[in-house]
Amino acid sequence: MQTYLVGGAVRDYLLGLPVKDRDWVVVGADAQTMLAQGFQPVGKDFPVFLHPETHEEYALARTERKTAKGYVGFSFHADKDVTLEQDLMRRDLTINAMAQDADGKIIDPFGGQRDLAAGILRHVSPAFAEDPVRILRTARFAARYKFEIAEETIKLMRQMVENGEADALVAERVWQEFAKGLMEKNPRKMIEVLRECGALKVLLPEVNALFGVPQRADYHPEIDSGIHTLMTLQRAADMGLSLPERYAALLHDLGKAKTPSDILPRHHGHDLAGVEPVREVNQRLRAPKHCAELAELVCRWHIIFHQVGQLKSQTILNVLKKTDAFRRPERFQTALNVCIADTQGRLNREHTPYPQRAHWLALLEAANQADSGKIAAECRAQGKAHLIAEQIDRARLAQIAPLQKAFRAAQDKTEKH
């Protein structure tokens, strides 16, 4: 019985990165051997055990065979005769198909170290095509390390998409990999890889449809709506924004794919037009509620947020109410963060100031100075409970108006200079 450290732990060790989780493979043993040594069985589908002291996962070396479409259609074989190389061969990429023995020696039968040094993601064997999740995982690794995909691997990924393997993916698994990819250092790269292999058209056709749709060059020097979306997503990542914010950044302009061709490159009403496509994506991916709600909010209101300097005080109050800013100020603030990414996610606009965010937050703070509890009590005492909402609005407007007037004056002064 021999144990080897495998997979991501070996890869990250060779890259000089912190090793978070350690997985082990056991060669020359069976389930009875593991149980006799005090290991606890935990694998539902595979022979995986927890070490009695470290609680790290130890899996028996195994081979796999495809039995049906999708990522669950597999049968496996694990016994004492399965070799380390056979176990490594079933893995997805060469950089994940390395092992380290007890003496620290690296076992690398498929050239993983070479590909790490070259910054290449390459599949281990044709068995890569048996699991469609590997399309998403490869795109995610590209986003993490900014590696390129080997030509033969991207070709195989295209074939998998053409054969309908991506259609067999279930929403939960897509979201799991997709969310991880959005939180990588270079999420733009994930979307680019998915587009290159054709999977984006299957998994996120609404995003794929943005590529080739022109925008006004004075607002968007990058011209292409798809490129702007990638730049906005990447800017959100560079800002260190959260998963809901990055997800909203990706979906904020879906309405531009709905713009009638006769008015291009203008996109009047794309904020409203994008709401339904955002809902469709949310439903298809079964996005968590906090991600789905923020994506819809940003899509619907980002243009209004940008144009705050042009709004009347009553309109501002209406927006604060409709976006639920009084009850959910944190979500309101995250929506404004995405608006910064939208503004700066344009060619040569990475450092464009966005005073609108601070102004919206100041407007919300000012409106909250109106003592709604006191106003409600006074109205009830006067037998005018039906006027509570109206009186609260009036008090809030009294707080908003001077602030908005000062902002517009400062804006006019800046424009004149």
Curated annotation (Swiss-Prot):
Annotated HD domain residues: 225-326
Gene3D superfamilies xref list: Beta Polymerase, domain 2 (3.30.460.10), cca-adding enzyme, domain 2 (1.10.3090.10)
Biological processes, Gene Ontology terms: RNA repair; tRNA 3'-terminal CCA addition; tRNA surveillance
Keyword presence, Transmembrane helix: no
Keywords: ATP-binding, Hydrolase, Magnesium, Metal-binding, Multifunctional enzyme, Nickel, Nucleotide-binding, Nucleotidyltransferase, RNA repair, RNA-binding, Transferase, tRNA processing
Residues binding ATP, per UniProt: 8, 11, 91, 137, 140
GO MF annotation: an example: phosphatase activity
InterPro entries per the UniProt record, alphabetical: CCA_bact, HD/PDEase_dom, HD_domain, NT_sf, PolA_pol_head_dom, PolyA_RNA-bd, tRNA_CCA-adding_enzyme
Note on how the cofactor is bound: Magnesium is required for nucleotidyltransferase activity. Nickel for phosphatase activity.
SUPFAM superfamilies cross-referenced by the UniProt entry: Nucleotidyltransferase (SSF81301), Poly A polymerase C-terminal region-like (SSF81891)
Residues that hold CTP according to the record: 8, 11, 91, 137, 140
Record-listed Mg(2+) binding positions: 21, 23
E.C. number: 2.7.7.72, 3.1.3.-, 3.1.4.-
Domain of life: Bacteria
Domain characteristics, as noted in the entry: Comprises two domains: an N-terminal domain containing the nucleotidyltransferase activity and a C-terminal HD domain associated with both phosphodiesterase and phosphatase activities.
Note: A single active site specifically recognizes both ATP and CTP and is responsible for their addition.
Family statement: Belongs to the tRNA nucleotidyltransferase/poly(A) polymerase family. Bacterial CCA-adding enzyme type 1 subfamily.
Name of this chain's protein: Multifunctional CCA protein
Record organism: Neisseria meningitidis serogroup B (strain ATCC BAA-335 / MC58)
UniProt lineage: Bacteria, Pseudomonadati, Pseudomonadota, Betaproteobacteria, Neisseriales
Gene: cca
